[in-house]
From Swiss-Prot:
Binding residues for Zn(2+): 130, 134, 202
Gene Ontology biological-process entries: proteolysis
Keywords, comma-separated and alphabetical: Cell inner membrane, Cell membrane, Hydrolase, Membrane, Metal-binding, Metalloprotease, Protease, Transmembrane, Transmembrane helix, Zinc
Organism for this UniProt entry: Rhizobium etli (strain CIAT 652)
Protein name: Protease HtpX homolog
Amino acid sequence: MNLVRTAMLLAFMTALFMFVGFLIGGRAGMMIAFLIAAGMNFFSYWNSDRMVLSAYRAQQVDERNAPEFFAIVRDLARNAGLPMPKVYLYDSPQPNAFATGRNPENAAVAASTGLLQALSPEEVAGVMAHELAHIQNRDTLTMTITATLAGAISMLGNFAFFFGGNRDNNNNPLGFVGVLVAMIVAPLAAMLVQMAISRTREYSADRRGAEICGNPLWLASALGKIARGAAHVPNEDAERNPATAHMFIINPLSGERMDNLFSTHPDTENRIAALQEMAQSGMNVSTGPVRAVNPTRKSRSVPNTGRGGSQPPRGPWS
């Protein structure tokens, strides 16, 4: 089903790209936009995950420089019956996390240094289980491609003014009004697609994540802490790349941005309530042979991500 959704997404984004191209340059602009969109679709399938990780300057870690964090992800992946994903950390004081990759065999999970500092090991396990659920549900391909194409469409809408703003442009059938429409409609349409994709999948990932880690309350507690942190601690890389907001477990954009006029995520309180109800009903075990992860409590130092000094890397809580 997700393959069908991904194909529909690519078709919609391509059509939107062509529409903006038509508004800017008529039929010639539409054909150029089609060729660009086709190339971007191909490129996004193979490289969008690396682009997102690069945008946040995420550093890959392993059992040597992040032993406890890596072990949590490894145990959760085993519980879920998934191949071990690549594990990344990115340097940000805001607690948050995301997953990416075109399939479970080529997937990655990334957490911020702020997440490891602010959350307990159990809460980190809940968050990583949620991200692994996205991988298992094959949400990551659609979410990552959406981030790449939405960013490109928003940028195209901004460029429309400069390349199509000439009132005397004979190639532009709708003139200056058409350019204004492109500037407004393109980013808005991309935002609406992000909303539709993210909101319908977060509840499913919450539920499956609770099953993977074995305790819905771990994730519920983590969501509350992350939401409070995201509301007060900015993520500068996310502010520069708002098209990736729907990939995170909690919207990383500050409340002052107009991007939050249409939220990319369900209400956090509703998500927490659903997890608490799941715990109260005893529905914390999946149909498969899942055992609860039991993270070892240690101090919360985090590995060096290569951006803040030359101290030797250490594992979280080590």
